[in-house]
Amino acid sequence: MKTLIDEAKTLRRTLHQYPEVGFTEMITTYLILKEVENTSFTLYLGSDATDINAQMGRPSEEELLKASERAESFGVDKDTLDKIRNGETGIVAVLDTGVEGPHVGFRFDIDGLPITEAEKDSHIPFVEGFKSKHDGEMHACGHDAHASIGVALLKYLDANKDELKGKYTIIFQAAEEGLRGANGYVQKGWLDTVDYFFTSHVGLVPLKVGTVNAKSKGFLSSKKFDVE
């Protein structure tokens, strides 16, 4: 477990340096993929993971091109980039144990925000050298931590798969900010047969560090309109 925690901390600090806003999370998707590609999970990318026609608030073609060029410069391989360069970012990972049991789903968001990160001595990422390398973009809402926790969970399930039953689906979701990305995965059918669904957020309520709060209510609803 200590190894998983240490790996999660390292991944979180790496992801924190490369924040990408919704539907442009190409480097992020690649970094997550590299962490989980050698597990027993079946991985789905691009149009296999999300329905592009169900996405809301997509970036412009110019923004997507800029993001793909940045990802290419980072070192994202062509095969991976070709699957996600059109805004079909994120990963869906599935483990079917082959043993009868419930289908459990987990969702971890991966996008950053259009915020310039502080360069102050009171800001730990700046002081310890892992602040954002992308001007005007920042992980200001903890999604770098969420993605890292999701990867750690996936690795834990994989390491203990012989003791499990049922099916596990883990969604590394693009474009949570603005509530734009979830519909693409929903319409793809990933949740159709899920019996239990879990998602989480770090620091959502003011509790002592290390405390888990099982429920939040009263402020998570939303309604969207398409204005033509």
Region roles according to the model:
Residues M1, G22, I171-A175:
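A generic secondary-structure micro-motif detector
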Residues G57, I91, L113, V127, ...:
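Histidine/acidic-residue-rich, glycine-tolerant segments that coordinate divalent metal ions
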Residues H146-G150:
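Alpha-helical transmembrane segments that form the membrane-embedded catalytic/substrate-binding core
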Residues K2-H139, E163-L164:
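Acidic/His- and Gly-rich active-site-bordering loop/insert found
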Residues T29, L33, V151-K155, N183, ...:
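Predominant activation on well-ordered alpha-helical scaffold segments within soluble catalytic domains
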Residues A152-K165:
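Flexible, small-residue-rich helix->loop connector segments that border functional cores
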Residues R58-K66, A152-L154, G181-Q187:
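Short low-complexity stretches enriched in small and charged residues
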